[in-house]
Each structure stands twice: as C-alpha cells, then as structure tokens.
Amino acid sequence: MEVSREIIEKLEIFQKLVKKWNKSINLVSGNTIHNFWQRHILDSLQLMQYIDNKEIHLVDIGSGAGFPGIVLSIAGVAKVSLIEADLRKCIFLEKASKISNNNIQIINQRIEKVAIDCSILTCRAFSKLNTIFNCIKNISVQEKVLLLKGKNYLTEIVAAKEMWLFDYLIHQSITCEEGKILEVSNLTKII
C-alpha cells in the first residue's frame, strides 16, 4: 500500500498522540502498542482500497481512538464525521482531527440518536453485525458499509441475515490472517 511521505509523517504524529493519550484514557489495548503501525494504522489504511472516490462524506461510528476515521481522513477522504459517545474520547478526537488537512466533524452522541447522510460508513472493534445494523438505522448510507471484523464474521453474517437483507463482499485483511473486511450494501431491515 503506497502513501506519500506527507501522509506517513502525519500518521506518525497521530501515533504519538494516541500513545500519549492512551496512558490516561485507554484508547487502545496495551498489548497492541508494540505492533501499533500494523495493528492500528495499516489495519485502518487498508480500507482506502475500497473507497473509489475521496471526495465523499464518510461516517465512522464508535470512533474511540480514531480508527479508522482519523486515518482515512489523513489519507485523503474529504469529509469525515466521527460519532463517539464518550466525551473524553471526543476531546482526544478533536485534538487528533487537527493533524488532518481535511474536514473532520466530531459528534458526541450515542449512534442510535444520530441522523446523518453519508456515502460510506465504517467501524472497527465496535460490535456484532446485528448490533451495528440496529445502531445505524437513522444513518442514510448511500454507497456501502465497511466493517473490519475478526474470526467470527461468518457467524455474525448468518445471525444478521435473520433480521436484515443485505448484499456483502468479504475481503481478506492485509494485517491479520483471521481478519476480514465486510463490504455491505443495500441494507434493509426485515419487518
């Protein structure tokens, strides 16, 4: 995955900020700090290969430490809205948003209460598919939902298919053998 020197420098600044704030508000698991670049930065950055047009509005739910939302903004996504219920994490996200040259909006609310339109929605390390789909029912996603998932992704798909109609593609993560990227479109709740 090729990125410019400027983007790498900004991602390194972001990495330092996450590590600094992690001491006080536990943004990422302590056992991932030693492998930070692959575990967090590249894991988020790999989503860029599924974003055809950078001039979009992307919504990242449960943004926490800014993965993948801040990383995708630094990589060139024009407008990113980060939805996070924890005020302390929103304060961190506000600081981190200054690293990007692009438009970042921080929304300090529970996801279920946010009504917003976007081209693409992302989330990472948030919840099971059914929970995610229920949380985003007020968010109008025009194009697709990109989800970074772990080894239980197939079980989650089967369970979600009982309550939702959707199309999906499964992509292999470049950072983890068990990791998958689910690309979901045409999401509709079964009545």
Curated annotation (Swiss-Prot):
EC number(s) recorded for this UniProt protein: 2.1.1.170
Keyword hit for Ion transport: no
InterPro entries, sorted: rRNA_ssu_MeTfrase_G (IPR003682), SAM-dependent_MTases_sf (IPR029063)
Pfam families: GidB
Binding site residues for S-adenosyl-L-methionine: 62, 67, 111-112, 124
An annotated GO cellular component: cytosol
Catalytic activity: guanosine(527) in 16S rRNA + S-adenosyl-L-methionine = N(7)-methylguanosine(527) in 16S rRNA + S-adenosyl-L-homocysteine
Disulfide bridges in this chain: none
Gene3D superfamilies in the cross-refs: Vaccinia Virus protein VP39
Broad class of enzyme this protein falls into: transferase
Primary location: cytoplasm
UniProt GO molecular function: rRNA (guanine-N7-)-methyltransferase activity
Subcellular location: Cytoplasm
Spans through the membrane: none
Keyword Transmembrane: no
Primary role: Specifically methylates the N7 position of guanine in position 527 of 16S rRNA.
HAMAP family: 16SrRNA_methyltr_G (MF_00074)
Family membership noted in the UniProt record: Belongs to the methyltransferase superfamily. RNA methyltransferase RsmG family.
Name listed for the protein in its UniProt record: Ribosomal RNA small subunit methyltransferase G
Gene behind this protein: rsmG
